[in-house]
Amino acid sequence: MQAIAIIAASGVGKRMKLPSGKTKQYLKLGVYPVIYYALSAFQQASSVEAIFVATLPSHIAYLQKMARRYGFHKVKFVIEGGKERQDSIFNCVEKIREVYGDDGALQDKVILIHDGVRPFIQPNEIDEIAELSKSFGACVPATKPKDTIKYIDGDDNRFFGETLDRSKLLQVQTPQGFRADLIMSAHQKAQSDSFYATDDAALTEAYFPEQKIKIFEMGYHNIKITTPEDMDLGKAILKRLRQSK
């Protein structure tokens, strides 16, 4: 079994409050840009045969140069992303279809979809998710929430509603893995219906409700760089990961 990775790197990161033209995936975290670490992990993962990256048009040449410079030979295509994250994933799905064709070349393969701003995923975790995706059809990493979670009052959003049972909740992350034909079909259907979901797992749930999604319990290191505070936390995680190797 070989996996194909899709890296979503088209976001502009409004919550990061960056100057115009700058995006969070290219901020320096230690020596390298945030996205470097994600690409490096997928390059090292033995289950991954090819990486497709969706990014802003102005960053395509930069990412291609990065892949050459650091020997990320699994990065096969860097293409233009879409208006929304889901559009970017769809663009990569269509590129995969174009490259592999519909003659069975994708049979027994899985597709792993990852956020380019989750730099701390580890190669062994990628391999485990790929294997579980193959075995169960779909697999998504998640962590247990540390905080109490409450609904907002439905009648007045200035107040809380009921408290949720934390033991039945998980915070979902990436990479999310799926049997190739399953996720490609889900994206094609969603594109036809102009339907948008919060992530690829939700898309699968919408179009293939019979497909159970295996839980892969992840540690708390696999954060998504979203706000300025995440960069400070990221530096601490990077230091700890380096010390543990």
From Swiss-Prot:
Pathway: Isoprenoid biosynthesis; isopentenyl diphosphate biosynthesis via DXP pathway; isopentenyl diphosphate from 1-deoxy-D-xylulose 5-phosphate: step 2/6. GO terms for biological process: isopentenyl diphosphate biosynthetic process, methylerythritol 4-phosphate pathway. GO terms for molecular function: 2-C-methyl-D-erythritol 4-phosphate cytidylyltransferase activity. The record marks 15, 24 as: Transition state stabilizer. It comes from the Bacteria. Transmembrane segments: none annotated. Gene3D superfamilies: Spore Coat Polysaccharide Biosynthesis Protein SpsA, Chain A. The record marks 166, 224 as: Positions MEP for the nucleophilic attack. Catalyzes the formation of 4-diphosphocytidyl-2-C-methyl-D-erythritol from CTP and 2-C-methyl-D-erythritol 4-phosphate (MEP). PANTHER family: 2-C-METHYL-D-ERYTHRITOL 4-PHOSPHATE CYTIDYLYLTRANSFERASE, CHLOROPLASTIC. This is 2-C-methyl-D-erythritol 4-phosphate cytidylyltransferase. The gene is ispD.
